[in-house]
Amino acid sequence: MEMPNLGDMMKQIQQAGAKMQDVQKQLEKTVTHGEAGGGMVKVSVNGRQRLLSLAIDPDIMDDREMVQDLVLAAVNSAIEESGRVSQEEIAKVAGGMINPADILKNMGK
């Protein structure tokens, strides 16, 4: 059985690291959207799961509890979509070497 070439392995690791940095930069620019209440609350989140925008229909501002519930629902929807997109992009680069969920846990640190 032939021993793996350590130099080749290090080169592959460096290439994967560079690709991951590119993916993280791309994810900062990737925007997903969520909405609730038939569009009364709309949010945008980037691929690093940072809230970018929040729009609330002024007609619902009198009902504080409803606004709070709709904001939570819209934000959670956008974050879920962002997480799905992020995992897909990371999986493309990782090629089975690493678990995308592990990377996502550490992205905000």
From Swiss-Prot:
Subunit structure: Homodimer.
Pfam family, one: YbaB_DNA_bd
Name of the protein in question: Nucleoid-associated protein Cvib_1034
Cited Gene3D superfamilies: Nucleoid-associated protein YbaB-like domain (3.30.1310.10)
Protein family according to the UniProt entry: Belongs to the YbaB/EbfC family.
GO MF, one annotated term: DNA binding
GO cellular component: bacterial nucleoid; cytosol
Coiled-coil region(s): none
NCBIfam families noted in UniProt: DNA_YbaB_EbfC
Subcellular location: Cytoplasm, Nucleoid
Keywords: Cytoplasm, DNA-binding
Organism: Chlorobium phaeovibrioides (strain DSM 265 / 1930)
